[in-house]
Amino acid sequence: MSCEHNSIRRVWRDWRIEMHIEPGIVDGAKIALSYATAAGAVTYAVKETFADLRASNFASYAARALIATFGVLVFFEVLPHFPVGVSEVHFILGSTLFLVLGAAPAAFGLAAGLLIQGAFFAPIDLPQYAINLTTLLVPLFALHALANRIIAPKTAYIDLKYSQVLALSAAYQGGVVAWVAFWAFYGQGFGAANVASVFSFGAAYMLVVLIEPIADLAVLYAAKSLRGFERAGLFTARLFNAA
């Protein structure tokens, strides 16, 4: 029975998703930089939260933040992934969270989901929490800024074109890859092996860039049937309405 239990634990360990920079890639005094970058990301997230609260209400924000947190845990722990180079290739669906729930709830969900995952499923990742938080949040805010530029104010998110969704998804995933590369080079330098690991990770991540826009469009298409729930406060107002 013990052998069977250990086997199940090994399978779970091998298949669960760990969104992280591998422990040891950035360590010692160098990890202090991540505290500063994470603090900046959290500060901006707080600013976005107050903006969201002014546009909606606390109940709506709290509901969307909880939905985002649950979604992130599902993305991290259930969806398939595979290790490549300095990290793992998997589906974060950051652009999906943004389009459906809004920037602030998405940021809360990513931060809370990452923390819960580290606390209960992967304690070895907790020392890298600030690194991983930066890696997930900064691209989200860049995505938000891009959305404000490429989406007309009169366009609801459910009416986005594939080219717009692709641009948003590529911006987020590209940002994640860029931050992973930064931390890897910052922590381990530009040795041939490290450069090869970073490039193999970036190349493999192109699979995500191809798939996630399709997932976003599918979610937005499904959301069209939920117009009757737009006043329930479970979605960002921009999902169904113009700015």
Can you say where each PLM-predicted feature lies in the sequence?
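Short helix-perturbing small/polar motifs within transmembrane alpha-helices
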Residues: 37-49, 119, 125, 132-178
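Hydrophobic cores of alpha-helical transmembrane segments in multi-pass inner/ER membrane proteins
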Residues: 34-43, 95-107, 137-145, 205-217
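Short, Lys/Arg-enriched N-terminal segments with co-localized hydrophobic residues
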Residues: 1-18
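Membrane-embedded alpha-helical hairpins and interfacial helices in multi-pass inner-membrane proteins
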Residues: 19-32, 149-235
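Alpha-helical transmembrane segments of integral membrane proteins
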Residues: 26, 30-34, 60, 64-68, ...
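Hydrophobic transmembrane alpha-helices
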Residues: 20-96
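Alpha-helical membrane segments and adjacent membrane-interface helices in multi-pass membrane proteins
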Residues: 75-140
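Alpha-helical membrane-inserting segments
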Residues: 46, 71, 75-79, 97, ...
